[in-house]
Curated annotation (Swiss-Prot):
Native species: Merluccius productus
Residues annotated as binding Ca(2+) 1: D44, D46, S48, F50, E52, E55
Cited Gene3D superfamilies: EF-hand (1.10.238.10)
Note: Is regarded as an important allergen.
Entry protein name: Parvalbumin beta 3
Residues that bind Ca(2+) 2: E81
Length: 88
């Protein structure tokens, strides 16, 4: 799903950069608002306009088998909330 969007080196750097809770630096990872929307669309597999909990779990497991568990109690986020979360 990330072919043409992320290079292998970028994926490895992102995984290394977010190994600990609250350590992912989104300000340097996403290069533009369009890129944020691309990532959202990839994760939102049912195209509902929201990333539900199961979609996020599936994405994290696909992205990295060793991905840490989410600590947020919310069960879905919309594209605007996702963009705000990764930009702010």
């Amino acid at each position: 799903a990330f072919a043409g969007v992320l290079a292998d080196a970028d994926i490895k750097a992102a995984l290394a950069g977010c190994a600990a809770a609250d350590s992912f630096n989104y300000k340097t990872f996403f290069k533009s608002p369009e890129e944020v929307k691309k990532f959202f669309a990839i994760i939102d597999q049912d195209h509902s306009g929201f990333i539900e909990e199961e979609e996020l779990k599936l994405f994290l497991q696909t992205f990295s088998a060793g991905a840490r568990a989410l600590s947020d109690a919310e069960t879905k986020i919309g594209v605007d909330e996702f963009a705000t979360m990764v930009k702010x």
